[in-house]
Design a protein with these regions (language model features):
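Bacterial N-terminal signal peptides
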Residues: 20-33
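Amphipathic beta-strand/beta-sheet edge segments enriched in Tyr/Trp
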Residues: 42-43, 109-176
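Short beta-strand->alpha-helix linker/helix-N-cap micro-motif
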Residues: 44-114, 128-132
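Short loop/turn segments that connect beta-strands within beta-propeller blades
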Residues: 149, 208-212, 252-256, 296-300, ...
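A flexible loop/linker signature enriched in serine peptidases of the S9 family
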Residues: 185, 196-203, 219-222, 239-247, ...
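Residue-level detector of Asp-centered blade-edge/turn motifs that repeat once per structural unit
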Residues: 186-188, 231-232, 275-276, 319-320, ...
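Hydrophobic beta-strand positions that form the internal "hydrophobic ladder"
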Residues: 192, 233-236, 277-281, 321-325, ...
């Protein structure tokens, strides 16, 4: 059965992949980001590493043919973005250029192989050489990857972007490097949807994982809440008070068009997409009590899956779509429960603490992150779906809320007031490596991580 989407959906943009021998003139005629690939292999298996060991990558060249101060800024931006992406990958480590036995900026196109022997004794497995150039109003990022030990070129890609699209090109390069060397799909091109009061009202925004390229998605000067990505990354479901009632909307991020999909009397909140995108779980109070329902993304086929006088909110699906975790106060305090997707076999999951909310099921299926109140502060915990393995992920000052998993299940985005204003942070699944993404004085809330 096909997913039922609104009939008004916009035409989806495409990223084209063509051969390295494709016409350069044809490439220049297109406005989107393009990629030429010279390598026929999908994954390179020549780099071996022990489990947990990172691949060391030297970065050389990044010579710049874009003249003037703008060119210098672009060069620095490309390196900064690449470094952030490789750090996020947790499998590739960029070697400090100052530690190399030669000036990395002097490596010129066509002469890269000459420098490989000088890296062999430095525990460096791969070398990335890159060059930025400009053709009319387009930027071209030419990147080559070399196996240091085998002394051979293993990848050659070119990326074209408009003058404001360099970071998107670098994110694409980063994902290609990660996939080519490890066989694992990268997350560098994913985004976070979130709520912020940057404009004075709480609106929906998007941003890259390095905190850059912030884009405002709603402009209704009202209260907008809980953006949730569709599994294909095409839509955002969110709650808005733009018409006075908490109604549920669907936003096509490819063109900005929105439609109201649930506006029943009372609450229309807590949207959660099924993994296949065919259903949406949500909380409604149309009958007085707040219960969980399923409906199609176009607002049709409404089905009630909980029935009680208690509150049922905040659903999250298991990655196989068979179960739903949610919050209910049916035991007297807000706790996490799990049930089958049709509403049967309900069981309580959390027993420690009197306030446990905001469950988020890992894409790997092995953990559920949630928020628990401990000694007056809100912290993020993780627990197995069977109720075991409880682990505190955040500690110290501040209120830590709204966990959202990365699509590979290795990171969690969340909001925290640890530095005063509410900001967006990410951390590894075990709670390590916590870092702030938002950088201004506005408040940031309820991040939701896009699919790949």
């Amino acid at each position: 059965m096909k997913s039922r989407m609104p009939s008004w959906v916009c035409k989806k943009g495409r990223v084209l992949i063509v051969s390295f021998a494709a016409s350069f003139l044809l490439a220049l005629s297109l406005a989107a980001l393009w990629l030429w690939q010279s390598s026929a292999a999908d994954v390179y298996l020549g780099i071996s590493r022990a489990e947990g060991q990172k691949i060391n990558m030297a970065t050389v060249g990044f010579s710049n043919k874009v003249a003037g101060l703008q060119g210098e800024n672009l060069n620095g931006l490309a390196l900064k973005t690449l470094r952030s992406d490789m750090d996020l990958s947790a499998v590739i480590s960029m070697v400090d250029p100052n530690s190399l036995p030669f000036d990395s900026t002097l490596v010129r196109p066509g002469r890269e192989m000459e420098f490989l022997p000088r890296l062999s004794s430095l525990s460096i497995q791969v070398m990335l050489a890159a060059e930025l150039s400009r053709s009319e109003n387009k930027l071209i990022l030419d990147a080559k990857l070399f196996d240091v030990s085998a002394r051979q070129q293993i990848l050659h890609n070119r990326y074209m972007a408009d003058m404001k699209g360099l970071t998107a090109a670098v994110h694409r390069l980063s994902d290609d490097i990660i996939y080519y060397l490890t066989g694992e799909r990268g997350i560098c091109r994913t985004k976070l949807a979130f709520v912020s009061n940057k404009s004075g009202a709480k609106e929906i925004y998007l941003m890259d994982l390095d905190g850059d390229n912030v884009m405002q998605m709603t402009r209704n000067r009202s209260l907008n809440l809980t953006p949730r990505w569709s599994p294909d990354g095409r839509f955002l479901a969110y709650v808005s008070y733009r018409d006075g009632n908490p109604d549920l909307y669907l936003l096509d991020v490819t063109c900005g068009r929105r439609t109201k999909i649930s506006s029943l009397p009372g609450l229309n909140i807590s949207p959660a997409w099924s993994p296949d995108g065919k259903w949406m779980a949500l909380a409604l109070s149309k009958s007085g009590n707040t219960n969980l329902y399923l409906m199609r993304p176009d607002g049709g086929e409404l089905r009630q899956i909980t029935d009680g006088k208690a509150i049922f909110v905040s659903p999250t699906w298991s990655p196989n779509g068979r179960q739903i975790a949610f919050v209910s106060d049916q035991g007297g305090t807000p706790q996490i429960y799990v049930m089958d997707a049709e509403g049967t076999n309900m069981r309580r999951l959390t027993f420690q603490g009197n306030y446990n909310t905001s469950p988020a099921w890992s894409p790997k299926g092995d953990k559920i992150a949630f928020v628990s109140q401990q000694n007056g502060s809100l912290h993020i915990f993780a627990i197995r779906p069977d109720g075991g393995g409880l682990l505190a992920l955040t500690h110290g000052a501040g209120q830590n809320e709204s966990p959202s998993w990365s699509p590979d299940g290795r990171y969690i985005a969340f909001s925290s007031t640890r530095q005063g204003r509410s900001g967006i942070y990410i951390m590894r699944e075990d709670g390590s490596g916590q870092r702030r993404l938002s950088s201004d004085d506005a408040d940031y809330y309820t991040p939701d991580w896009s699919p790949r």
